[in-house]
Amino acid sequence: MTTLSATSATPELRLGLCCLNTVLRSMKPPVFASRSCIQATLLNKGYDYVRQLARQNIADIHTMMRWNYEHGIYVFRLSSDIFPHITNPVVDRTIYTLDDFVDELAELGEVARRYNQRISFHPAQFNVLGTPNPKALQQTIYELHIHATILDMMGCDSDSTMVIHGGGIYGDKEATMKRWCRNYRRLPAHIRNRLVLENCEKAFSLEDCLKISEEINIPIVLDNHHYDCYKLLHPKDIAAQTSIEDYIPRVLETWRRRGIRPEFHLSEQGCGRIGHHSDYISQIPEYYKEIPSKYGMSVDIMIEAKMKEQAILQLRSQLPMSSF
C-alpha cells in the first residue's frame, strides 16, 4: 500500500484528534468507533453480536483516518471501546479475543500508514499501576495488554503509545510512587515499550511524574490544563508552582531518551467543576508553539476539546503552513 507523504525534514508541531469526529458522527448512518452494548445484551445476544459491533467500529476507523488525512490531521487517538467488553471479566477469553480480528487489525495498520496516522490510546482512569489491590492491578495489566496488543497487531511503530495517569495515592504518595515503579518494572515488555505517563490535577503533579520517570525511564506527557488545575487545588505544594515553561526541557528529555516523538496535551477550562474541558481552545500557548524552533524537536499536541476536529481546524491559523 502506497504511503502518502506528510512528513517534514525540519522540526514541526502537529495537532492531534481524540477518538471522535463530530462531522462524521452526525452523518446518517453515523461514522464512529465506539459502538458497544450493556452486559445484559452481550449475555443475551452472544459473542457474534459484539464481534459484529467491533468490525463496524474498525470499518469506520478507516473512514475517520481518511478524513483526517484529507484535512491535514496526522495524529489520532483511538477509542478504547473498539472491541465491546473484550476486557470484561465475565467474558470467556478463550472464545472472544483479539485473535478474532487478526486480518482486520493488520489492514487497519496498513490504512494508518497509508494516511500517515500516528496512532495512540488513552486507557481509562481505572487503570491504576500504583494500586495496593492485587485484583485491581491484575485487571489493569490485562487492560494495558489488550491496548498494546492492538497496536502490535496493527504493526504500529514505537511512536504509538498508551497514555495513563498515576491513579490514586492511597493515603501515602511516596509509597504509591515506589509501588508504581515496582509494578511497572514487572510489566511485560510489549506494555512497557508503549506506556507513557501523564500528570493529573488531583494526585500526581508534573514534578511527581518526572520523579517517576527518573526512576524507570518512562516518557512524560505534559497536560497544560491538568498542570494549572493541580496548582489551584494544591496551593501548598511548592514544587507544583514552578513555571510550566521551566518544565518543557525536562519533559522533552524523557522522550528524547526513548527515541519517541513527544506528545503534549492541550485543553482549557470549560463550564462546571475544575478540570472540565471547553468546547474550543482559544490559543496554542507560546511555550508549545516554540518547541520545534527552540529545542529542535518535532512535537504532537493532542487537542482535548469537546468539539474535536472543529477545534483543531479553528486553531490552524495559529500554526505555520508546514505543520499541516
State the predicted function of each range.
Residues M1-R118, N127-I141, H145-C156, R186, ...:
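Alpha/beta catalytic barrel-like cores
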Residues R118-N127, D159-H165:
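Glycine-rich, often proline-containing surface loops adjacent to acidic residues and nearby aromatics
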Residues H122, D223, I301:
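Conserved, mostly hydrophobic/aromatic
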Residues L144-I216, H225:
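Eukaryote-skewed repeat-based solenoidal scaffolds used as protein-protein interaction platforms
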Residues D228-L232:
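Short active-site loop/helix that positions an aromatic residue
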